[in-house]
Swiss-Prot record:
Functional summary from the UniProt entry: Required for polyglutamylation of axonemal tubulin. Plays a role in anterograde intraflagellar transport (IFT), the process by which cilia precursors are transported from the base of the cilium to the site of their incorporation at the tip. This protein is specifically required for the kinesin osm-3 to dock onto and move the IFT particles which contain these precursors.
Similarity comment: Belongs to the TTC30/dfy-1/fleer family.
A GO cellular component annotation in the UniProt record: axonemal microtubule
UniProt-recorded name of the protein: Tetratricopeptide repeat protein 30 homolog
Source organism (scientific name): Caenorhabditis briggsae
Location of the protein in the cell: Cell projection, Cilium
Molecular-function GO term, any one: intraciliary transport particle B binding
Keyword Cytoplasm appears in the UniProt entry: no
Repeat (TPR) residue spans along the chain: 9-42, 43-76, 141-174, 175-208, 238-271, 384-417, 418-449, 451-484, 537-570
Keywords for this protein: Cell projection, Cilium, Cilium biogenesis/degradation, Coiled coil, Repeat, TPR repeat
SUPFAM superfamilies: TPR-like (SSF48452)
InterPro entries attached to this UniProt entry: TPR-like_helical_dom_sf, TPR_rpt, TT30
GO biological process assignments: intraciliary transport; protein polyglutamylation
Amino acid sequence: MNAMLNIKEGEFTSTIYTLIHEHKFNDAIRILQYQHERNPKNLAALSLLGYCYYYTQDFQNAADCYSQLSYNYPHHSQYKLYHAQALYHAFKPAEALNVVTTIQDDDLLNESIKLEAAIKYQEDDLVNCRILVDQLPTDDATVLINTACIDYKEGNYSEALQKFNQATEFSGYQSGLAYSIALCYYRRGDYNSSLQLISEIINRGIKDHPEFHIGMVTEGFDVNVVQNSMTLHESALIEAFNLRFAIYYKTKDFKAAKECLTDMPPRHEHDYDPVTLHNLAINTANTDFGDSSAKLQFLLGSNPFPQETFANLLFLYCKNDYFGLAADVLAENPHQSFYCLNEYQFNLLEALIYMPTSPEESLKKLEKLDKECMTRLRKIAVEIQIKKEQKTSDKDDSLEMRNLIESYEDELELYLPVLMTHAKYYWDKRDYLAVEKLFRASNEYCNEHHTWKLNVAHTIFMQEKKYKEAALFYEPIVNRKYDGGILEIPAMVLANLVVCYIMTNQTDEAESILKTVENAEENALMSNPNEKYFHNSIISLVIGSLYCSKGNFEFGMSRVVKALEPPEKKLGVDTWYYAKRCIVAAIEMMAKNILVMRDSVVMEVIQFLSSCEIPGRNIYTVPDDLFEQAAESKVKCNVTYEARMLKAALLTVFHGS
């Protein structure tokens, strides 16, 4: 043990306290562990070891230390209290309660009652929690805070807010209290007030704790990770960044939400708290299904985990068509189904899961959900109209109006998944008229919603003869970010609008979009030269696919090949998908002797396929599968393998003709 060898005789105690004072807890823990192994009954070493574990939030090891101390020194009631506190923080409420009930020291009575109340709070036993808190002295600020926490958990956010503010006046500024107030504002829908308090917490953290490297990862600096510690916990920085993430995510400012996760003090992944891990998972849900689902699965097996984890994992499975897995998780966790899912979520999940096997039953559930959502939407719409007619300028009434509007928007967010699930059933059957009929029926309530307008545009576009009407829906979506953030618009939206323009002879408008996207990609590459940008490629691929579908394969294939030059920069999962569709269609037509292409075009395609082999090795053509795959099958799931197969097939039909 080198650390021990470096300590001079007689300097053991001063060395340990110096390490603790300098927050070098890992070094102190290593020395204390060694000392404890040499002398298991060393009171000082074991007590300090428990303290270090507790400070670094390793509560299970802290509980083990205090368990030994309370066993070896039963008359030291303080150790029993520390043992119970460590078990409580390790989320073992039953064990913590067993320990705290053995404390008989009158001097620790109030602390014991506080801890027992906290345990009841953790178990959601709010009735007994309030009874215990009422036994405590009323002049204690922590009692006021505890009462506020109970009010918050009961949904009485205004009362909780008032008590947290009183506690702040009584105790002075504390980051934890400021966070609690911000959380109450968030629950009341007052996001501006919440964000102001969050900013204050973060600014104080930047000033008081430069060692936490706040915001440096976002700026691109390579910094050391931060360990979990009581100082980090008391700063409330992690909680503040996660709350800011929740606000931005809810208001659909996903870029700002992502920055919240990189702005917070950097930690190792194994040190992440459950809320941070959950937020990281939902942040990548649309881009990295495997990583997102793995994080949510891990959380589901942890204690505790955010209540939203269960629903988010199930909806993530359904979104990616893993209905069997979703059904298994639902069946294997009946307790979580009852605790974590409300009636709406449960019914929607059942409709999604059983749609492939029992569509009639699923459609009945969806129709029932549809009616329930529409009823609530109509009710809130009437309340909003009444409020508007009153035309009051009172602040409370203004907040009430804002809350009504937010309730309407929240209800709309509940209705849209029902509508889209219903529409998807007909979409998969290519019954686009039925889909359009569903959307028209919801026009009164959804016509301002971005998702609704986008899906209406797609539905009209797929009917082929309604390109002009489809363009009218796509144009507002594109125009919102045309001049500054065109690359933030999904490439398929731009591609479909370009096709609409081409099919309605509006070539100038189509060229304008292509030029704007090209310039935006060039500017983006100057800032991030190692990044890949696929918008221009996907648009060109869709245009190429359009010409192929109209029978002009030679021009279409040339457009496809040029869209992916150079492959090192342009090859990706999406771009390869559109390219290979055209190539497969051409091979099929040539094999049937329906199509004859010039030799130069065929050789151009063969050369393109050859150029895809090297950059395509690490581009997998199937989503991350949750089932273990054999090594051989995984080799066949990348661009390299598919490019070689297509080249062989193309050469076969080319020489055969």
